[in-house]
Amino acid sequence: MKKLIIAATLAALAMTSAAMAAPIRDPQPGDLKANANYGFDQKEGGRSAKSLLTGGDVTYVLSNHWDIQYVNNYTKGDNDNKINENYLVGNYRFTPYLSAFAGGSYVKTETYNTTKSYGYQVGLKGQIPLAARWQGFASVGVGDDVYTYEVGVGYDITPNWDAHVKYRSSSVDVDNYDDDVKGWQVGMGYKF
């Protein structure tokens, strides 16, 4: 029953609106994990996006409940529009499966002009074991400049290496520049 409730919570998060890659499984104080993502079938507005390395994140586990995380998401459209999202957030784990995050954002858009915006991002993240080495994850974030969600699945190749695939969507509104970024990403993570 507990897994059903958690799965329903993750599905609800995915259907509403800081994106993260596969989270650390069984986090311990002092753990450090880095993820890098490769985008395919990406869209910037209604156009294709040609950016391949689409960002990643670095997470450091401070305690049994707290992490600090830096996240970068980069998209370059076929028309050379660029959107670079950066977040520095604190994550608080309520349970091994559900956490909340809050922090600052810096978003830079390069179109016919360049705009930069500092703001905030808050949201929820969830993860659930699916099988011995598999886990599902989802997140939803809201802020003054960006609304974002993602849903994905990760596979632990070794205790330190994992691979993941996810769908990510981000709605950006920076100084009267509105755009959407969405698409599929694959990535690798390493826990030091």
Q: Where in the sequence are the language-model features?
A:
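Cleavable N-terminal export/targeting peptides
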Residues: 1-33
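Short glycine/proline- and aromatic-enriched beta-strand/turn motifs that initiate or cap beta-hairpins
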Residues: 20-77
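Repeated loop/turn-to-beta-strand initiation elements of outer-membrane beta-barrel proteins
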Residues: 32, 64-70, 96-102, 130-136, ...
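Membrane-embedded beta-strand positions in outer-membrane beta-barrel channels/transporters
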Residues: 33, 55-59, 87-89, 121-123, ...
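Transmembrane beta-strands of outer-membrane beta-barrel pores
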Residues: 36-44, 64, 72-76, 104-110, ...
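Solvent-exposed loop/turn segments connecting transmembrane beta-strands
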Residues: 43-52, 75-83, 110-120, 140-151, ...
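Structural signature of outer-membrane beta-barrel channels/translocons
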Residues: 59-61, 91-93, 97, 127-129, ...
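Outer-membrane beta-barrel "beta-signal"
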Residues: 122, 128, 155-162, 179-192
